[in-house]
Amino acid sequence: MQISKAQTRNSAKSGDINMKTNNPSSKLVKEFLRESNYIERVYDDVALEDAYKAWRYLVKKEELTLILILKTHGILMKRLWPEIAGRMRMEDVRVGSRICPSWQLVYGLLSEWVKKYGKANTEEDILNAHIEFERRHPFRDGNGRVGRLIFLWQLVKADLPVKIIKADWPDPNGEQARYYKLFGE
């Protein structure tokens, strides 16, 4: 699914945040990571610390690779769920009513994704990259949080405005609900 530029625009009304730096100590990065955790209903400080560690690792890198994605997932999930940290899923899963690609296809699909979107540098391409990453659902858990870390990294590397998606369940018209609609969920 291709997303138009109009759909990728962030409105000031919904809280645009323009980060023109990849400074890993940025207060705005921490807010992005906190909201990213909250979207998944992960509220503890350990998970936020690990998200920040994953960001500090990721932001130093210049090229998006399969190994980089796996290491980012490993850092993010090491204390939360060590058995799956840094490993692609080994079972079939569904997200809501959507059946994700078979686990046997995940490695190939993620490799193709890296080739197609690894150098994405426009708002439209970066949003499409994020949507396609989430649809591949390469991990047993942590997909949304890793996907949003990559999304943030690509926006910062491209010197584009960063939108913090507010976790606002159960509001059916809130930012989080609109965000999930991008994935057809």
Residue ranges and their predicted role:
Residues 1-185:
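FIC/Doc superfamily catalytic core
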